[in-house]
Amino acid sequence: MVIANSNIIFVAGLGGIGLDTSREIVKSGPKNLVVLDRVDNPAAIAELKALNPKVTVTFYPYDVTVPVAETKKLLKTIFDELKTVDLLINGAGILDDNQIERTIAVNFTGTVNTTTAIMDFWDKRKGGPGGVIANICSVTGFNSIYQVPVYSASKAAALSFTTSLAKLAHITGVTAYSINPGITKTVLVHKFNSWLSVEPRVAELLLEHPTQTTLQCAQNFVKAIEANQNGAIWKLDLGRLDAIEWTKHWDSGI
């Protein structure tokens, strides 16, 4: 996918990895970048606008845990303004296994609901033009960080959902791929709670191992967007971008 002159919606585009990715996207010259985030950050939006004045950067407050109907209303506003949207990035995520329901609601259900909502505008069975979805999942969807099993399971669920979306592309016209960052130096990983406090030092222990910067992750994210491979499972770890070949242990046969 060519980012230049495209219209992109980025859910949680002002977070750690999100903000650096928004910067890299803006540098690539889309026509519009619409940022949806729970917390307003006027300084960050102003920075993105200044980074490339030719790009129209717009912000809307959005909590991924709202009902699908509310998301559809917001998306209608955006589609009425832009007419077309080429790419949806679902990037909302929290890491706190003390908040079980919210972790699942943000990391998994929010991704499902936002995706479901945009299908009203994209699904070719409804006369839509199709589109592309990039879901930010995690390497913990491959192998869990067992001290945070709720977070890891939520990301595994998001990965499975994304893989299914890709296989439905011939029906819906909507393609999808997953972005799976490794341990990245963000506020998210500097301090977080393990499930039932099984390992109070889990954040500290993780950061003792090699990590990557948000900029490294963002630059590889943009490469994945440009590659635009339906069904791709991208691993963004230690400054590298690698396509993962998923081992099939079972097939439904349908």
Swiss-Prot record:
UniProt xrefs under CDD domains: ADH_SDR_c_like
Active site: 151 (proton acceptor)
One CC-aspect GO term: cytoplasm
InterPro entries per UniProt: ADH_Drosophila-type, NAD(P)-bd_dom_sf, Sc_DH/Rdtase_CS, SDR_fam
GO biological process per UniProt: alcohol metabolic process
Reaction equations catalysed: a primary alcohol + NAD(+) = an aldehyde + NADH + H(+); a secondary alcohol + NAD(+) = a ketone + NADH + H(+)
Top EC class of this enzyme: oxidoreductase
Binding site for NAD(+): 10-33
Positions bound to substrate: 138
Gene Ontology molecular function terms on file: alcohol dehydrogenase (NAD+) activity
Keyword annotations: NAD, Oxidoreductase
Pfam family for this entry, one: adh_short
The enzyme's E.C. designation: 1.1.1.1
Subunit structure: Homodimer.
Family assignment from sequence similarity: Belongs to the short-chain dehydrogenases/reductases (SDR) family.
Name of protein: Alcohol dehydrogenase
Organism per entry: Drosophila differens
Gene name for this UniProt entry: Adh
